[in-house]
Amino acid sequence: MGRAYQNRKESMAKTSDMKAKVYSRYGREIYVSAKSGGVDPTANLALRSLIERAKKDQVPGHVIDKALDKAKGGGGEDYSPARYEGYGPGGSMALIECLTDNPNRTFGDVRMAFTKTKCKIGTQGTVSHMFDHVAIFVFAHEDEDAVLEALMDADVDVSEIENDNGMLTVFTPNTEYFKAKQALVEAFGELEFEVDEIQFIPQSYTTISAEDMDMFDKFMAMLNDLDDVQNVYHNVDLG
């Protein structure tokens, strides 16, 4: 599963405009998590992890507080998750995760990004079977065996552990996320996670031509411009 977090999703924080989009997307995700599971991060583990990740990505506190306050109010929009998939430039594959209050609008917007870049949107399962849905934890630790033992003692299904000069990357099935994180924290204290989330990781990467890369960049830009898009995963080798 190497290079898991190198291509995990398109960078969205290169300009102030992009940062605003990152804040908006975190705000929406925090609102949805708090509304469905409660606004107390100590009781809502999904919300707690999301807030921690938002802070790591330098999302301002007022953005987080606004989303929580909105969820406390009980009103507001009703967002539901949606996932689209298909083939991108050069035969590449893409998965697009959305949160939407209007599925018809969102599908039309995503389909337009595919159509305008000569890509092909597919039905559910078209390319998702070529991605692994995994929980990933990246943190500094010298003893790989101790980490594996702690996870196994907690009955966590560990898919793989990679060690890059003392920086460990732990992969588990996505359904093991909370159990794995709890086991790591209980065994080693409050670890400083560089990556701590659930992602879709391609089973293999593809190299595309310079011409296709230009179209791929346009494809990614169009998707990232859509307010409803939360994450874009692909199998293009950007190295």
Curated annotation (Swiss-Prot):
Main location: cytoplasm
GO CC annotation, single: cytosol
Source domain of life: Bacteria
KW NADP (keyword) present: no
GO biological process: regulation of DNA-templated transcription
Similarity field: Belongs to the TACO1 family.
Identification of the protein by name: Probable transcriptional regulatory protein ABO_1803
Organism from which the protein derives: Alcanivorax borkumensis (strain ATCC 700651 / DSM 11573 / NCIMB 13689 / SK2)
